């Protein structure tokens, strides 16, 4: 006659192959109950009942495929999910994946709202240059450059023969006679408003030269000396301005001016034979 085990004590005393009864589980509603048996540190048999709440959630396809992987080793015959005998569940780590827009918004909130990132190029204050209270005054470098240019132009018009300033020969006394003699020799070029800009970098281009001098005044011709083989700048250039006062302003403003990590040298162009 077949005997039935009716109490937990009878289950413990039952003769099993490994000394422990098999684990069993059943589902009731949204809960899953798992009953297991094991030996404690004192060598005694204990019964462990675990309760799981069943929740349904939508997971990425990669996660669903990973859960269907075939188990191997000691877990070859295990059911889906972790096995307490071979798997130890550590601290649960929650990860949240956000898009680039959400990251930008989060990063902006971490910035110090009291710190002003604007810096004025005129007075180095903590505001934008367009809102600078010193804009248009002597502290403005652009205004200072325009002031120097206007002063140099006025000086060139009022006193062209001032000591220390180069004056072309045809503007000196008797220059007109000399100029008329040389007219038939091909010297019909007017260099009175030409300047020579030296100490230029090798990477200088015609566009850079145009940007350098266009704010001073209109010019009629430019020449940038280049190496024949490499095509690099030789270090000097000539600019013919339309008006002599603009040429004087260019010398006053650009001579000694830092450009491309070099100090420019600007002077009147010497007459060519």
UniProtKB/Swiss-Prot annotation:
Gene3D superfamilies linked to this entry: 3.30.70.330
A biological process term (GO) from this entry: formation of cytoplasmic translation initiation complex
Domain RRM: 193-271
Keywords: Cytoplasm, Initiation factor, Protein biosynthesis, RNA-binding
This protein's record includes keyword Cytoplasm: yes
Subunit structure: Component of the eukaryotic translation initiation factor 3 (eIF-3) complex. The eIF-3 complex interacts with pix.
Name of the protein in question: Eukaryotic translation initiation factor 3 subunit G-2
Highest classification ranks of the organism: Eukaryota, Metazoa, Ecdysozoa, Arthropoda, Hexapoda
Gene name for this UniProt entry: eIF3g2
């Amino acid at each position: 006659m077949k005997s039935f085990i009716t109490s937990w004590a009878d289950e413990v005393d039952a003769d099993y192959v490994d000394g422990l009864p098999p684990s069993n589980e059943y589902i009731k509603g949204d809960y899953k109950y798992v009953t297991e048996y094991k030996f404690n540190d004192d060598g005694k048999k204990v019964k462990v009942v675990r309760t799981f709440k069943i929740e349904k959630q939508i997971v990425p396809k990669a996660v669903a495929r990973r859960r269907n992987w075939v188990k191997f080793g000691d877990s070859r015959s295990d059911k889906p999910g972790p096995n307490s005998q071979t798997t130890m569940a550590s601290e649960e780590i929650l990860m949240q994946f956000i898009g680039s827009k959400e990251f930008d918004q989060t990063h902006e909130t971490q910035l110090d709202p009291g710190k002003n990132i604007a810096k004025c190029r005129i007075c180095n204050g903590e505001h934008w240059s367009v809102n600078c209270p010193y804009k248009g005054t002597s502290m403005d470098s652009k205004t200072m450059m325009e002031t120097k240019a206007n002063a140099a132009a006025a000086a060139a018009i009022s006193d062209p023969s001032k000591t220390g300033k180069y004056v072309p020969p045809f503007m000196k006394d008797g220059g007109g006679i000399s100029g008329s003699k040389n007219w038939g020799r091909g010297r019909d070029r007017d260099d009175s408003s030409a300047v020579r800009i030296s100490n230029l970098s090798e990477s200088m281009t015609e566009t850079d030269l145009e940007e350098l001098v266009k704010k001073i005044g209109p010019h009629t011709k430019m020449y940038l000396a280049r190496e024949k083989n490499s095509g690099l700048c030789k270090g000097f250039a000539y600019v013919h301005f339309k008006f002599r006062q603009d040429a004087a302003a260019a010398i006053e403003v650009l001579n000694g001016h830092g450009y491309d990590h070099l100090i420019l040298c600007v002077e009147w162009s010497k007459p060519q034979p």
